[in-house]
Every structure is written in C-alpha cells, then in structure tokens.
Amino acid sequence: MVEFKNIVKYFPDIDKPILDSINLKIGEVKIFTVVGKNGEGKSTLAKIIAGLIEFDEGEILVNGIKQKNWNVDKAKNNGIYLVSQVPNLKMNLRVWEYLSIYWFGYEFFMPMNKSKTYKYYRWLMQFYKISFDLDKKIKDLNIKEIYFLLIIAALKENAKIIIFDESAAYFSQKEAQAFIKLLVLLKKSGVASLFITHSEITDAIKFSDEFIILKDGKCFRTVNKESILSKLESSSDKVFVANINCNKFEKDPIKFNLFFEDFWKYDVSFSLNKRGVLGIIGEEAVIKTWEKLFLGELLFVGCIKIDGIRYERINIFECKAGFLPLGIGNLFPDNSSILDNFLAKFMNFENKIFIRQSYINQIKDFFKKKMEFYSEEKIYRILYSKSLAFSGGTLKKFALYREMYIAKSFLICFSPLSNLDHKAYNEMSVAIRNYSKEKPVLLITSNLDELLLLSDNILAMKMGEVLLNVSREKISKEKLKELLFL
C-alpha cells in the first residue's frame, strides 16, 4: 500500500498551493479516475506519485514505512509507473530494443537480449492481447501505438500501479474502447490504474471503480457515481468571453494548398488573412496529424505561399512562423531557465551566433509589456528560474509568449487553451486575440468552445473533408455540433 500524507505543492507563480494537504491511500486493485477542472493539479499529483517532481510538505509511506527522498527510481522500485500525457518518442530504436532497455536495463557495450525480450512479450500477450510488430522503428509508430507501447513498457514484473495522464486524449472512439478493455485486464492481473482526465468524465463514470476528485487544492474520494458532476463545479460559469473582431481583413497574404495522408486523405486549400484567427476544427484523433504536418514529419504535395514565396516543404524556421504544440509536455527543457530558452530559440530563428546584451534586454522588455501587473523583481525571478519551478499552465503561457516573440509571418497554435486554470485561460485568450490584431494566427483544435472563442473564420473538417469554410459570425455552436456529429 502507498500512502501520501498531507502533501503540499507550491509553484512560484501561484500564490496559494496547487495541492493543499492532500491525503491519499492506494492499496486496493481498482480503476481509479482522478477528475477535476483544468488547473486543479491532476497532472501535478500524478508526477508526485510517480516521483517525477518534488513536493514541499508531507510524507510518503509504502507498506507503513516512511520513504526518504521520494523519486522516480523509488517509485519504480515500488511498482509505480507513469504513462505520460504527451509522449515524445522520435527515436531510431526498434520496438523490441526500447522494451529491452525498459524491462531489463542496458549497459554500454553489452548487447541487448532480443530472445529474452520476445519471450517476456509473448508471456505478457497471454494476458493483455496487445499485438506489436517488434521490429518496427519507434519513429514510425502512430499516436495510439506509442501510448500502448508505453503501457507495455510499464508492465514490468513488479508493476502495481500505472498512472495514465490524459492517455485517451487523442484516441478515436474505437481506440478508446480498446484502452478501457486494457484497464479492465490490468485490474484482473492485479495492477491498479489511476486514470487522470478532464474531458472524458462522462465515459469514465461507466468503467471506474472509484473517483479521486481534486478541487481547490483538496482531495475527495467517492464511489458514488451520481455525486461526481455535482462535486465538480461546471466551468461554464467561468468561461471568459473575448470580443471577436470580425473586421474585413486584407486578403490572402498566406495561402495553403495541401494534399497529404495519414488516417485519411486530405485535400485542403485555405488562406490566412493579414490579421485575425483562422480556426480549423477536426476530430481529436487527427489533430496530431496536423501537428506532424507542420513539424515537417509528414510528406505532402502542394505548397504554402507567403508574400509571394512558395514553400514546397514545411519548415517552421524557413517560414518564420511561431509554433505552439499540443499539450504541456516538451515545451521547455527541464535544465534551462526561461530566459536561456527564449535566447536559444531566438538565436536559432534569427541565425545569430553570439549573445548580445541587447538581445537579453529586448526579451526583458517584452516580458514587462506582457506581464505589466508583475513587479520588475518578480519578472526577473521568473526569467532566471528553471522550467521545473512552474505549473504546466504557466509554462504554456510562456511558450506562447516565446513563439509570439520570434514569429515573423504567422503563429500556429494547437489547442492552446487546453489543460489551463481559469487565470491562464483568460491570459492566453487575451494574448492570442491581441496578437491576431497584428499578425495572422492559425488555430487547430478539436474543442468547439475554444474554436468559437478565438476564431474570426472557421474551417470545419471531418474524415479529411472540408465541410465548411465561413466567418465566425455566420455559424452557431449548435450548427457545428450537428455538422460534426458531436
């Protein structure tokens, strides 16, 4: 049994603790679902349990024994594994090589044991029915395969608790059903699951044994499925409304003519006005496809035309575009300060070699304008702090500021308002709308509320086909839901 007693966690940019005297025991083999509004600390709690980040106060006991210096190695030694929210596996290893390293360890100059890996994999498949081409390169896996690979990797012989942080976020309905079956199989095999979600609460009610609710820094446990939604105050009463400015912007400085293929075939043409937000909405499962396209990882036929220049391949640096990716993982390296990261991205973008004091001063001035209500001392403390010191929502805001700072042509945002607390949600909304008065923004999302809040024009797609391309003022939420079968 693992027990977390009076756990307190602070972030320097938030006045009150994100987790305030959390008490949690995990002993039974159940499917636990951790629910709460954006910014309530769900992912923070998951990382503390998995030993990835430190907590400020409290203690952890395993089978009644107090643990000193809880970290990821101690968590794994006690059978606790985390399947991350936004996995970033672009390595050249084959699947069996990755599993061999994860299951059995690896020493330099020692060959990996292929037969041992295949044998353990076949033994696992008796219970979990997850089939893989073990000789396939990891970089060639799709998002569903990557998630299931991470799950298989976590199924070491000592596995007792597996934490899934928004793991079904990019699954189709069919894939989500396969994931739920896996949770049930894990339970039958004696492995408890902690499924962390915000958007799939209604579905989670159907398969979960018990719920852990995070609200206002506190933790509640219940098996009463009827009480879940009443405990969670609806976020609709706190929705921030931005003024949508549907002026007649100057037309077509940036044109996209793209044909590409992943889940479906896409043949799409659209234009970005000189200012404003064009929002593209599509299924959750294929938003990752668009991200791969703009990262240059997906081949396409066609071109992007910016100020009369044709680009027949997508390179964010060549196009001088800002890029805010999905999720909140991988936005900043753990070991660099916010200022260092801004400088590195700026110098790479502008092809600079030597750091000048003027570059640093410009970044500081930019932050002062963006965070005008912060004292100069606090801004400097933020700039020289490492990314691990901040909450996920704050890091996402800083990443948006960074991309705004370097972008020369346009800004691409993938679901920028997801997984944010109310304050960060408001700040990000205002920042994007204000930026769109100067430069164009391409918003790509599966969230209708986010789309309608931020967009001036809307392009709706389903199964690779364009259903409509209209101005925001000419379409309602109800019509979009009907059109997209939401």
Swiss-Prot record:
Every ABC transporter domain range: 2-241, 249-486
Show the stretches that span the lipid bilayer: none
Q: Which InterPro entries match?
A: ABC_carbohydrate_import_ATPase, ABC_transporter-like_ATP-bd, P-loop_NTPase
User: Mind telling me which SUPFAM superfamilies this protein's record contains?
Assistant: P-loop containing nucleoside triphosphate hydrolases
Query: Which UniProt keywords are given for this protein, alphabetically ordered?
Result: ATP-binding, Nucleotide-binding, Repeat, Transport
Which Pfam families does this entry report, sorted A to Z?
ABC_tran (PF00005)
Determine if ATP-binding is one of this entry's keywords.
yes
| Molecular-function annotations in GO | ATP binding; ATP hydrolysis activity
Decide whether keyword ATP-binding is in the record. Answer: yes
Instruction: Locate the residues binding ATP.
Output: 36-43
Query: What family does the Swiss-Prot or TrEMBL record give for this protein?
Result: Belongs to the ABC transporter superfamily.
Task: Specify the protein name.
Answer: Uncharacterized ABC transporter ATP-binding protein BB_0318
What is the protein's species of origin? Borreliella burgdorferi (strain ATCC 35210 / DSM 4680 / CIP 102532 / B31)
